[in-house]
């Protein structure tokens, strides 16, 4: 099929994108990048995919823009049938490949699952997702089951210093200056 090599499972896998439908008859695929700048997905190599429970390394042969899409060519994937077998595969790398961040900057993956508490000590819940709004990122927080305000989900802007007072990845807590009733 393709030039995919069996690989060991990554220690700390992170999904950078997903392979979409095939494009053309020569094995090209659409790719959906989850990186902030879509083209940054190509800065992280090698890519890993998981097929039938097995980790495999896939080698990028080339890529280009096509209309609004990015399409890729993988080594050894030379026809539409081979490309179709990779549709919906997540593109994964080990997080050790990501660059170190400056103090006060965080990868979204590191914030997922953190408990969010107010400066007064009220537990708002757990971060389950992040959203990009253009002006700032937003924490999507699943409220605790017995939330005193009957809220199921909260959206809290990730404004460092203004709303976000402290992030402690060791204890997996984020302290915020936020009204729990909002």
UniProtKB/Swiss-Prot annotation:
Its main location: cytoplasm. GO terms for cellular component: cytoplasm; ribosome. Residues 102-182 form the PRC barrel domain. Keywords: Chaperone, Cytoplasm, Ribosome biogenesis, rRNA processing. Pfam families: PRC_RimM (PF24986), RimM (PF01782). InterPro entries: PRC_barrel-like_sf (IPR011033), PRC_RimM (IPR056792), RimM (IPR011961), RimM_N (IPR002676), RimM_N_sf (IPR036976), Transl_B-barrel_sf (IPR009000). It is found in: Cytoplasm. GO terms for molecular function: ribosome binding. GO terms for biological process: ribosomal small subunit biogenesis; rRNA processing. The PRC barrel domain binds ribosomal protein uS19. An accessory protein needed during the final step in the assembly of 30S ribosomal subunit, possibly for assembly of the head region. Essential for efficient processing of 16S rRNA. May be needed both before and after RbfA during the maturation of 16S rRNA. It has affinity for free ribosomal 30S subunits but not for 70S ribosomes. PANTHER family: RIBOSOME MATURATION FACTOR RIMM. Binds ribosomal protein uS19. Belongs to the RimM family. This is Ribosome maturation factor RimM. It comes from Klebsiella pneumoniae (strain 342).
């Amino acid at each position: 099929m393709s030039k995919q090599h069996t690989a060991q499972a990554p220690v700390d896998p992170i999904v950078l994108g997903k392979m979409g439908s095939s494009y053309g008859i020569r094995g090209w695929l659409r790719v959906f990048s989850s990186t902030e700048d879509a083209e940054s997905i190509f800065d992280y190599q090698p890519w890993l995919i998981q097929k039938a429970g097995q980790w495999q390394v896939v080698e990028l042969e080339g890529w280009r823009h096509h209309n609004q899409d990015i399409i890729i060519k993988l080594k050894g994937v030379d026809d539409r049938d081979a490309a179709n077998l990779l549709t919906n595969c997540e593109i994964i790398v080990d997080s050790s490949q990501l660059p170190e961040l400056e103090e006060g900057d965080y990868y979204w993956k590191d914030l997922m699952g953190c408990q969010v508490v107010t400066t007064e000590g009220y537990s708002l819940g757990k971060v389950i997702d992040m959203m990009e709004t253009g002006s700032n990122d937003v924490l999507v927080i699943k409220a605790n089951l017995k939330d005193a305000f009957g809220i199921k989900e909260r959206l809290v802007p990730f404004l460092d210093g203004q709303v976000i007072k402290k992030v402690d990845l060791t204890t997996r807590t984020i302290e915020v200056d936020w009204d729990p009733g909002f």
